[in-house]
Amino acid sequence: MSLGFGLGLQYSKLSDGGGFEGFLNQFPGASLGLSLRLLDRNYTGFCIKVRRSSDNNELDIGFLNNELDIVSLLNFVGSGDGKVIIWYDQSGNGNNATQITASKQPTIVGNGSLILDNGKPAILFPTNLLGNMSFNSVNQTTLLSVASILSFTQVNYVLWSESAAKGFFYGGRLRGVNGLGISDGSIKSITEENLESKIAYFNYNGTNYDVAENGNSVTALPNGSNFPSDSVGRPNISEVEFDGKMQEIILYPSEQSANKVAMENNINNRYNIY
């Protein structure tokens, strides 16, 4: 059952008349923009659709002061859990990430408390649910994401392609993985692995994937190949599901290496990771 519109949308535009510029205003052309902050001053939609555990009612939650409307979210969920059914795409392309199976939905509120990572709202993808959030297949050349993993016991795929059986991961001490990397027929990763929140940068340069975390210089993962994505997290296989927290995923169909530093600075100014 859906309760319709959330209160957050009423307030989202009141705060951006004083010069607010979202990430997608500064860096236009994204094919996918999922975030718990407002990415575009012209976006008038919602942030997430949430199901509360107490009675399974659903509500769209918008933005307050250009951030997720936490007040409306917590008032709606109450003392139970809030599960994310839809993570709305702010790019204007309608590529909303969705999980309709209740048992596989990630969590934004647990026992009445907001899920946080580094002090900011986050969506928790706990292990053993074999869950993901699917969206329309999107071609990407550059990927930026903000996430953290909770365990090294599986390959933590933050983004996956069901059609191509390829993806991007945040680490996990399994199958030779040592940090951020890609699987495109073979597994390749950089060697900077920990459980801390990371800003990840993946960029396909036509030959290799250039990969970096937290504003560092890129490492080229050799013999890479470009591929589309259609899933936040990887479904159905426990040793490769994402076990962690996500806050932002932004994809571009065109190469964005010239904007790397400015993009990472914008994201870090919000999340204060490094």
Predicted segments, located by residue:
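Extracellular, beta-strand-rich glycan-interacting domains
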Residues: 3-6, 42, 47-55, 63-65, ...
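N-terminal module-boundary/linker segments of secreted carbohydrate-active enzymes
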Residues: 12-46, 51-52
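Short, surface-exposed beta-strand/loop "edge" segments at domain boundaries and coil↔beta transitions
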Residues: 13, 50-62, 127-134, 164-170, ...
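Extracellular glycan-interaction surfaces
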Residues: 37-39, 77-80, 85-128, 137, ...
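Aromatic- and Gly/Pro-rich amphipathic surface segment
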Residues: 61-85
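Extracellular glycan-interaction patches encoded by glycine-rich segments
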Residues: 181-183, 187-188, 225-251
